[in-house]
A protein has these predicted regions:
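Glycine-aromatic micro-motifs
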Residues: 1-131
Length: 131
């Protein structure tokens, strides 16, 4: 892990597919999403692309972020890429086990859990309740 950052003017949400609903981000003025940033090799990136279903399910977007070093706390501007689910995918309700996994990550990085809660509330409001 290189460090953590915040993607400004983006919001967090759960969008779906036939296999479930997963996290993604979308432009949203005034919002922000905390993120962890990893150093990846070309081989790592290729493996991540396959895992994330890129470019069919998610696509990659380049961003320049201010990253707070995990060891030093020093802020450095770096070019990064993020995976974003294609916009035509519908809002969906995630499984409880997926939300727990995401929450574990949020806790381990010290992120405010309200970002996940808000995304989950939006999913329930827009997609309806799970049967």
């Amino acid at each position: 892990v290189m460090g953590t950052s915040v993607i400004k003017d983006y919001g967090l949400l759960f969008k779906g597919s036939l296999t479930g609903a997963y996290l993604t981000i979308e432009p949203k003025k005034g919002s922000e999403v905390p993120v962890a940033v990893w150093i990846v090799t070309e081989t790592d990136e290729e493996a991540l692309d396959r895992y994330e279903g890129c470019p069919v399910f998610y696509y990659k977007k380049d961003m320049e972020l201010d990253i707070k070093g995990i060891r030093t706390g020093k802020i450095r501007k770096r070019k990064c890429f993020v995976y974003i689910m294609h916009e035509e995918r519908k809002i969906g309700i995630p499984s409880l086990s997926y939300v727990r996994t995401c929450l574990d990550g949020y806790i381990s990085f010290g992120f405010d859990e309200h970002y996940l809660s808000e995304a989950q509330i939006r999913a329930v409001k827009e997609a309806g309740y799970e049967d």
